[in-house]
Amino acid sequence: YKEGDGIICTGWRVGELYYGGYSQYAKVKGEFLVKRPKNLSAKQSMILGTAGLTAIQCAFAVKAREELLLQKKVVDVIVTGASGGVGSMAVMILNKLGINVTAVSGKKENHDYLKSLGAKNLINTADLDKDARPLDKGLYDGAVDTVGGNILANVLSHIRDKGIVAACGNANHYKLNTTVMPFIIRGVKLWGINSVDTSKKRRDFLWGELPNLIDFSLLEKSVKEISLDELLNTYSQMLEGK
């Protein structure tokens, strides 16, 4: 890299094992960096951040079953935790890829926003946060799950033959109370997504794709810019669910 190059650094446990998560200047390993695409501003890259990198990996994992897309005119994918960072971006990316998206959110006040991102159908979180049947009616060709727990178990029971579920979070619960039925009867694939240590080559590709799949005019409505001095107070409010 040369002085003045636009770069992005997400993941690699920076701010956790390495200092520099929130700072004006940081010293990091060169292999942690990705060259920022010319059609992506510094602010836009941080609006996306780790959530955007995770969301696009989830969306591409679900889309990986190309034979499904060739066989059906309409592909149905469910996204849990759709009001969150990863979930909302996954809704937008999947919609851009031509996929029919069902969004799951416990915040009814966000339903109109999710529709503006491209969600065709909406489900309340409470409808899925219950004990799951071993198999239920096949409703979806794939899923992006950001919450885990009972919600993921219910999603798995509703996936159609050969569907793919990309799982990346545990906000509901880290335990998964399911059976082998979705896997051995319908051939469902559960694909774990970890964007923290994604290879540099893969990151370069994904960051190059993100600007083409994101409508920042919509995302920026949910963005609030704060100063470094406001971090602690903002974190406290987030933990209180405000």
Residue ranges and their predicted role:
Residues 1-35:
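Glycine-rich phosphate/adenylate-binding loop and adjacent beta-alpha elements
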Residues 23, 119, 139-141, 183:
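Local beta-strand N-terminus motif with an aromatic residue
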Residues 128-138:
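Short amphipathic alpha-helix with an adjacent loop that forms part of the alpha/beta core around
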Residues 46-125:
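Mid-domain Rossmann-like dinucleotide-binding core that forms the NAD(H)/NADP(H) cofactor-binding site
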Residues 201-242:
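C-terminal hydrophobic helical "lid"/dimerization subdomain
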Residues 17, 150-216:
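Glycine-rich phosphate-binding loop and adjacent beta-alpha segment
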